[in-house]
Amino acid sequence: MAGKIKNNKDLIKAPAGSGKTTYIRNELKSICLNNPESRILCITYTNRAADELKKNLEGANITVSTIHSYINDLISPFYSHKEVLDLYWEIYAEKIKNRIKNVTNDENIKKSNQYYIEKYGELTEKAVQENISELSYGETPFTSLYTGKLSHDDLLMFANKLIKRYPILLRKIGDKYNYIFIDEYQDTSAYVLDIF
């Protein structure tokens, strides 16, 4: 199913305010009327857009979500798995090492490092790795490297790499949904578009 979804794309290009969201909502209604058993995923960029798409669609087999919320829901059950933690280290080990060393002598990093030492006793790569037993999504503009809390942007990048490494996650999407709609495509990260 995932392969079929990947090869069955329609792209609607139009300027802001031209009715793309209305078009998608009408398509959703049509599918619900003609194929009431269909399972539909509709993801968008903002909560406002998600709320707009949900109007008059209650009770249908439709999941409407923001991109970040959906991606987090998809991968969060695996945040404590060894393979996921290993991928985190593969991606962030160098950044963590540089932050520990604080070669730029950044005052904020210095304070952050001191706080970590006060909380955990020592600040080494090994200590950080041992203290991160599970990742999380922080809904913040920056990733908290020492705690495994992924930022708004890094969540999408991390999910992309995780799904590429473990394509079964993509199959979960394809097996669960007959249709996938992405609203606000122009605002969507390339990492997400690459997934779908």
What positions do the PLM features span?
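Residue-level recognition of alpha-helix termini/interfacial anchor residues
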Residues: P77-H81, Y92, Y166
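Accessory N-terminal region flanking or inserted into the helicase ATPase core
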Residues: M1-A16, Y23, R39, N102-F181, ...
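P-loop NTPase Walker
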Residues: M1-K82
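Catalytic micro-motifs at enzyme active sites that drive phosphoryl/nucleotidyl and oxygen chemistry
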Residues: S30-L33, S144, L169, F196
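Short, glycine-rich nucleotide/cofactor-binding loops
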Residues: D187
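Walker B catalytic acidic pair
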Residues: E184
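Conserved phosphoryl-transfer catalytic core
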Residues: K82-K110
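Phosphate- and divalent-cation-binding pockets in alpha/beta enzyme and binding domains
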Residues: E52, D73, K172, Y191, ...
